[in-house]
């Protein structure tokens, strides 16, 4: 009796994942087709300026591989961090009443940690452009 139930459970699990596997195979096939399609359809151009950046119809002013200040990357990372904070807060705000006080405390701890990080960045001068 035990062996037949184990086999039945194993068969049931495999049947559940057949659709996931089929979805994965179809997604991989469509992705490969989409990646290969431009190779066959797009016209090929062998001009000298093909890889250059386009600056509103004007000639290039400098090389494309120009160096950026590290502060641009720092501000970008900070933007992503605080943008993700807002993304995490929206679902919580929608269902705050149903979640109860434990969820409120966890979100409060989350906000305190992010605020401490922001104060540290501000005090250390990471946001100054001097």
Curated annotation (Swiss-Prot):
One of its GO terms (molecular function) is NADH:ubiquinone reductase (non-electrogenic) activity. InterPro entries: NAD(P)H_OxRDtase_bac/plastid, NADH_UbQ/plastoQ_OxRdtase_su3, NDAH_ubi_oxred_su3_sf. It is found in: Cell inner membrane. Its EC number is 7.1.1.-. The chain crosses the membrane at residues 17-37, 74-94, 99-119. Gene3D superfamilies: NADH:ubiquinone/plastoquinone oxidoreductase, chain 3. It comes from Neorickettsia sennetsu (strain ATCC VR-367 / Miyayama). NDH-1 is composed of 14 different subunits. Subunits NuoA, H, J, K, L, M, N constitute the membrane sector of the complex. PANTHER family: NADH-UBIQUINONE OXIDOREDUCTASE CHAIN 3 (PTHR11058:SF9). It is an enzyme of class 7 (translocase). One of its GO terms (cellular component) is NADH dehydrogenase complex. It is a multi-pass membrane protein. It catalyses: a quinone + NADH + 5 H(+)(in) = a quinol + NAD(+) + 4 H(+)(out). Belongs to the complex I subunit 3 family. This is NADH-quinone oxidoreductase subunit A. NDH-1 shuttles electrons from NADH, via FMN and iron-sulfur (Fe-S) centers, to quinones in the respiratory chain. The immediate electron acceptor for the enzyme in this species is believed to be ubiquinone. Couples the redox reaction to proton translocation (for every two electrons transferred, four hydrogen ions are translocated across the cytoplasmic membrane), and thus conserves the redox energy in a proton gradient.
């Amino acid at each position: 009796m035990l062996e037949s139930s184990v086999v039945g459970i194993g068969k049931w699990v495999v049947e559940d994942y057949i659709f996931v596997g089929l979805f994965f195979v179809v997604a991989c096939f469509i992705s490969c087709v989409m990646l290969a399609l431009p190779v066959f359809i797009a016209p090929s151009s062998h001009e000298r300026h093909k890889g250059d950046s386009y600056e509103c119809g004007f000639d290039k002013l400098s090389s494309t591989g120009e160096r950026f200040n590290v502060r641009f990357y720092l501000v970008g990372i900070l933007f992503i961090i605080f943008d993700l904070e807002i993304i995490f807060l929206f679902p919580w705000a929608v269902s705050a009443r149903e979640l109860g006080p434990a969820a409120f405390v966890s979100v409060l701890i989350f906000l305190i940690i992010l605020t401490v990080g922001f104060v540290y960045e501000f005090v250390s001068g990471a946001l100054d452009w001097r």
